[in-house]
């Protein structure tokens, strides 16, 4: 998903926020229709549990809006690190949503991870106005981690009753409809740029329009490939690859946007990576023991 985030951040100065969101979902639909149809034929829109599918769409939409917004307000690497802390919130919420019991090791990992998040947020500097970071951007990034955790827990439930290609397609269809409605009613007056009910997208430069199409296609590929990866690859390997996104995002943030993280942000990011990996590997070990 780093590729989609990089496109979004690159477009933030040229394209209205709502148009970026619109493109991400609408241009994903054709590819997702093909995947769903070839996977399930005439049953490609069949759903067994509409309540959970709608909840999946809600939390997926809210999470994406907050991540996309924070990318425009705070450094690329910091947004990624805070968003990747969702594993901490999954552990916090799982006893209440899934009824799971959390042991001492995972609770310890959660506490350590929250310390890492605290270090990255650096609230003391925000209160004293000694940092140029946006408090709104930081808040959105942390909230996106929380809503992504809710999404992950819902996806666990959906995995038992729904096909991933169908839920992904319906999620994009519902969200696209909501965004089109918002554009018709409110226009594109988001983040200080004013459009004429979305029509300005037709007169943007070719490169920007192409980038928006690529954003949608890449977004649909990310959804599909993630589903495949969880099907064919061990969770431990995926967890390691997932948290590589934090140093990679920091690297690209420095190379492309000249964003230099503070030592406190680096330490906090490393703590979050460590705690999330501990939670992940503990979960894998628990699963293997239960199978035996």
Model-assigned labels for residue ranges:
Residues 105-124, 264-283:
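Hydrophobic transmembrane alpha-helices of multi-pass small-molecule transport proteins
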Residues 23, 80-85, 159-174, 220-254:
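Helix-helix packing/entry segments at the starts of transmembrane helices
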Residues 86-111, 247-266:
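C-terminal transmembrane-helix exit sites in multi-pass transporters
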Residues 14-62, 147-154, 170-189:
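Transmembrane alpha-helices of multi-pass small-molecule transport proteins
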């Amino acid at each position: 998903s780093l590729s989609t985030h990089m496109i979004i951040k690159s477009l933030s100065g040229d394209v209205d926020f709502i148009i970026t969101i619109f493109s991400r979902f609408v241009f994903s639909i054709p590819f997702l229709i093909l995947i769903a149809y070839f996977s399930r034929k005439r049953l490609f829109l069949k759903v067994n549990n509409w309540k959970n599918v709608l909840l999946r769409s809600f939390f997926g939409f809210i999470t994406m809006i907050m991540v996309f917004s924070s990318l425009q307000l705070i450094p690329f690497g910091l947004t990624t690190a805070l968003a990747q802390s969702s594993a901490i919130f999954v552990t916090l919420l799982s006893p209440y949503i899934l009824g799971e019991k959390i042991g001492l090791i995972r609770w310890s990992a959660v506490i350590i991870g929250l310390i890492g998040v605290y270090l990255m947020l650096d609230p003391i500097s925000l209160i004293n106005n000694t940092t140029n970071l946006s408090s709104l951007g930081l808040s959105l990034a942390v909230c996106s981690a929380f809503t992504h955790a809710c999404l992950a827990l819902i996806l666990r439930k959906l995995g038992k009753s729904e096909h991933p290609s169908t839920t992904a397609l319906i999620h994009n269809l519902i969200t696209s409809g909501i965004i089109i409605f918002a554009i018709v009613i409110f226009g594109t007056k988001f983040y200080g740029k004013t459009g004429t009910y979305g029509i300005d997208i037709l007169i943007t430069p070719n490169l920007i329009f192409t980038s928006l199409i690529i954003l949608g296609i890449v977004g649909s590929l990310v959804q599909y490939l993630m589903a495949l990866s969880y099907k064919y690859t061990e969770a431990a390997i995926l967890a390691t690859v997932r948290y590589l996104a934090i140093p990679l995002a920091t690297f690209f943030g420095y190379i492309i946007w000249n964003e230099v993280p503070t030592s406190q942000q680096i330490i906090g990011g490393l703590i979050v990576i460590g705690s999330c990996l501990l939670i992940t590997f503990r979960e894998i070990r628990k699963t293997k023991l239960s199978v035996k």
